[in-house]
């Protein structure tokens, strides 16, 4: 255990100030988003609106992110990561504040769409920023640590979201309590501006002026690299379809199936994120044993039994345990995938590569959000959620096997 901590401590000391500031920025933004994620669906229900509205808001948010990710990635490559992140954080914070106070269904949909647009600017620039400020040998550890810290910050946000809402409810109505919590979440998100403002970007070194059209240049100069981006995109689309059926509605699942309180829901989701953070540290160890591709696949496949346990159990305790392990195992491979992708593309198009990868994932959420709510409404609370979780397990299985077949052969070709 001492060797384990020493390894991570040694790694962290090698990171420059830009990386540490980026981590702080993501801590603040993830606390804010964690508070929103755990409570916002319930806010919509508290306004007296239906499950369909929740589905529409989630679909519009994801669709907006999918639409803007590639343009945001190109902007990040051409204008600089820091400028794009500052723009995204300030506007996202303001939009989140508006979402905390508006009640009209139309405004809920508009602000949900705007959230998807502006949060993408931070989202699309973070991984390329870390890649450009690190060495290849640092990246598996760095991306795992970054993801773990982000997840831990999300845990804090989820816990705050649940407990603050119940605390405020002691003094005011449920609706007002939720609204106060959401406003605090938006303030946390805006705090990310301050570490970003302190970052120092050397664009002359990282983003040469002669790189005018990264997308066309990349196709001409590195067709095999473009192939890698497309292959990653297909894998992410399959996982995104499965994720979009389940993940946006986990708070409603625990509320509807088990009548859990806001505090209990916040605690469960927070524990799931905490388990994910711990699993992130295990990722590099698995990579050393079996390689990057197999590590991703093994972690994803190991999550499936726990997903099905969550789907069919009638016990809140077992559902929570299944959720914790599914969450940890399924997400532990994400930083490994990011490291693998960043290692295969040029600096001038890292933002574009990352944006395409995230875009297709968001498309999965956009398309499957309304499908999920329709299935639950058609089959009822128990069988509706059970069917949704089962479909997700099937899509995860297909996505994992595809990743293994495609990238194992690609990795073998690279080694040759």
Question: What is the role of each PLM region?
Answer:
Residues 2-16, 201-234:
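Juxtamembrane intracellular "pre-TM" segments in multi-pass secondary transporters
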Residues 4-64, 228-269:
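Helix-loop boundary and gating motifs at the non-cytosolic
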Residues 27, 95, 106-122, 237, ...:
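Hydrophobic core of transmembrane alpha-helices in multi-pass small-molecule transporters
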Residues 68-80, 165, 279-292, 376-377:
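Helix-to-loop junctions at the C-terminal end of transmembrane segments
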Residues 83-98, 294-309:
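Structural signature of the two symmetry-related core transmembrane helices
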Residues 113-150:
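Cytoplasmic helix-loop-helix junction between adjacent transmembrane helices
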Residues 166-187, 376-396:
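A membrane-interface helix-boundary motif in multi-pass transporters
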Residues 186-206, 402-407:
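C-terminal membrane-cytosol helix-exit motif in multi-pass small-molecule transporters
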């Amino acid at each position: 255990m001492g060797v384990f901590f020493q390894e991570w401590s040694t790694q962290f000391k090698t990171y420059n100030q830009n990386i540490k500031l980026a981590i702080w920025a993501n801590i603040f933004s993830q606390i804010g988003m964690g508070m929103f994620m755990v409570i916002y669906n319930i806010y919509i229900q508290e306004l007296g609106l239906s499950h369909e509205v929740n589905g529409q808001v989630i679909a519009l948010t994801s669709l907006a992110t999918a639409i803007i990710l590639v343009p945001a990635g190109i902007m990040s490559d051409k204008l600089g990561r820091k400028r794009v992140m500052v723009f995204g954080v300030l506007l996202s914070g303001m939009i989140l504040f508006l979402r905390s106070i508006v009640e009209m269904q139309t405004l809920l949909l508009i602000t949900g769409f705007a959230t998807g647009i502006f949060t993408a600017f931070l989202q699309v620039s973070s991984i390329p920023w870390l890649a450009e400020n690190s060495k290849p040998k640092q990246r598996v550890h760095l991306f795992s640590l970054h993801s773990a810290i982000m997840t831990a910050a999300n845990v804090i946000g989820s816990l705050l979201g649940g407990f603050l809402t119940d605390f405020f409810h002691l003094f005011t109505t449920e609706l007002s309590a939720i609204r106060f919590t959401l406003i605090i979440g938006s303030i946390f998100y805006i705090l990310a501006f301050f570490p970003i403002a302190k970052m120092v970007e050397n664009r002359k070194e990282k983003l040469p002026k002669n790189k005018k059209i990264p997308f066309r240049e990349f196709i001409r100069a590195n067709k095999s690299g473009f192939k890698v981006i497309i292959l990653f995109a297909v894998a992410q689309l399959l996982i995104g379809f499965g994720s979009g059926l389940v993940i946006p509605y986990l708070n409603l699942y625990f509320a509807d199936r088990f009548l859990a309180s806001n505090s209990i829901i916040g605690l469960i989701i927070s524990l799931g994120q905490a388990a994910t953070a711990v699993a992130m540290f295990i990722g590099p160890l698995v990579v050393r044993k079996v390689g990057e591709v197999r590590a991703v696949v093994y972690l994803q496949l190991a999550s499936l039994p726990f997903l099905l346990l969550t789907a069919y159990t009638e016990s809140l305790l077992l559902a929570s345990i299944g959720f914790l392990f599914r969450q940890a195992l399924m997400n532990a491979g994400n930083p490994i995938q990011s490291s693998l992708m960043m290692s295969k593309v040029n600096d001038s198009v890292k933002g574009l590569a990352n944006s395409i990868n995230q875009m297709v994932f968001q498309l999965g959420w956009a398309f499957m959000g309304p499908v999920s709510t329709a299935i639950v409404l058609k089959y009822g609370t128990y069988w509706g959620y059970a069917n949704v979780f089962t479909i997700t397990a099937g899509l995860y299985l297909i996505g994992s096997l595809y990743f293994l077949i495609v990238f194992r052969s690609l990795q073998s070709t690279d080694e040759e």
